Amino acid sequence: MEIKKVYFSQKMSLYSPIQQAKQPLPFFQSHQESRDAFWRSAKKQCAFKAVSKKYTVYFTIAKSRGDVIFNNLLIEGETFEWKKFFRYMEACARFFIKENCCFLFQSPLSEEWLRIFHKNGYQGTTQLNKKLVYHTALVLGGGAHGAYQIGVWQALKEHDINFEIITGTSVGALNGALILQGDMKKAVNLWKKLSTRQVLALPEMAAVEDLRERFYRERRQMTKTALIEGGVSSAPLEKMVKDNLDLSLLKHNPKIRLYTVSTKLPELAEVVTDIQQTKTEEIPDWILASASFYPAMAYRKIGKNKYADGGYRNKIPIDIAINKGATEAFVVDVQGPGPAKKIRMPDIFIHWKCQTLWTLGSFLLFDSQRNQLNLQLGYLEMKKRLGYYYGNWYTFHSVKPARTYWRGFLSYLTKEIQLELSFFKSIKFWQKLRNLYKNRVVPETCGLAMLELLAKKHFLLPNEIYQVDMMIQMICQQDIKSMPDDLLAQIGQLSTEEWRRYRKYQQKIQNERTKTVYFDYLLQGKRKDRLQHELLKQPVDTLLILYLYYLKEEQPWHKNFHMKS
């Protein structure tokens, strides 16, 4: 099941299917009243669409502290029996992570309707309520960037969200064991201080301040050692695991089950290990086997068999969580190499993807500064998934001011510069913007998308919670013509691909300078025809430049009159 918000701007594309959808419950006196009410709720951003293999359900909700309250509902597709219907809607309610599923009606229900609700476990008359039952899993993917996963756990723990099952591959197996122990401080401190030599047995290297030079030296050293020795020894990782894990505590945890994934060699067969059911002395072996990225690292021998990283067969083990009884899962993908295993999820299985759009650094080369950044990213991403903050690339207390600024900008383009904005009706424009933003963009969220893209161009880091006004001020003060001197020191070690993009952007800086000067000339000279030409030729790039100009023009007003927006 996939649940997405429905925006009013989608009315044209969704008009036909919603006109064919019907309300299964008597929220309104007619189906048409229900459809009209759905679009009114879409204007208030309270409308959603749930899609599964058989059904598409459109619904609107209100939320209180512990309740999800359905107040309108339309179904497209064949009708199902009541038991399946309520299970489906309760799955939709679990998506919002509340205690109770409620249905609120404007008029008293008939005895027959009350009988149907009460038979399916609901209580009440006008508002029908039922306590939701959760069997939650935490799915920890492979990919070395384990600090991000611990950041996610910090946010979950902060809001008392518990899970019955943990499944982990590679670094996810190690973190699963740390989480099973429940010692947050130990897990955070471990990742904050972790370096490559605490994981892999590499020869000592002279200290190097330059991050790029250090990266290439460590990579060459790792490659050479792996080739000579048939995989770098993970003896330091083994010591760290044994020093930090309480095996008795892991073995006898009564509330959470931990399952790890490894790959048996040479068959390349997936092996799932129930950590609590294995021998106590073998627990470190199975965790290390799951994290042995052979041939870069040495394989792990358990008994007579050889095992390597579980990511070769199942890098994001959602299917194991489902097979062990999970009805929903927080899935933490940390950008491990290789494709994910294809699985078929049950219609009523809910999963929340907890992954960042930002790259997380080098694979197998660990850096304490980058780990601290990734910890913060994981924490903030999970807080957004839980609905406490907002944003896509960045994290905001509220994004409403972004919509206000954007409306002001569009008015500036049409009324002051008198530009024509027909490209907003072009599918290509929205496709390009979505590809650049790497997420869904609709007219209602366009202002936020453009603001975040500007923030990226101006090197703002994503590891803090922003106010929209504060972000705009920082964007306007940051010179796009050069990267901040301390940027790399704040980020930490980069990956090969990140270094490549870093060099590429340094080469593009001159082009950015030229563009800025050119558009400043057009705006100062009010060259409407040239501006219109550029806007139609390259709408996304041109909009970003014009939006920055507009925001800079607005800054003096906002400094003195902060309530303008």
Language-model regions, residue ranges each:
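Short amphipathic alpha-helix that is part of the acyltransferase structural core
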Residues: 1-37
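Short secondary-structure junctions
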Residues: 3-6, 121-125
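Patatin-like phospholipase
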Residues: 31-35, 64-65, 126-166, 178-565
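A short helix-loop-beta-strand connector motif used in the catalytic cores of GNAT acetyltransferases and
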Residues: 36-57
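Short, high-confidence coil segments that cap the C-terminus of an alpha-helix
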Residues: 44-45, 98-102, 324-327
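Acyl-donor binding region in acyl/amide transferases
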Residues: 66-120
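Residues forming the Rossmann-fold NAD(P)(H) cofactor-binding site
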Residues: 86, 150, 173
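Gly/Ala-rich beta-loop-alpha elbow adjacent to hydrolase catalytic centers
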Residues: 168, 172
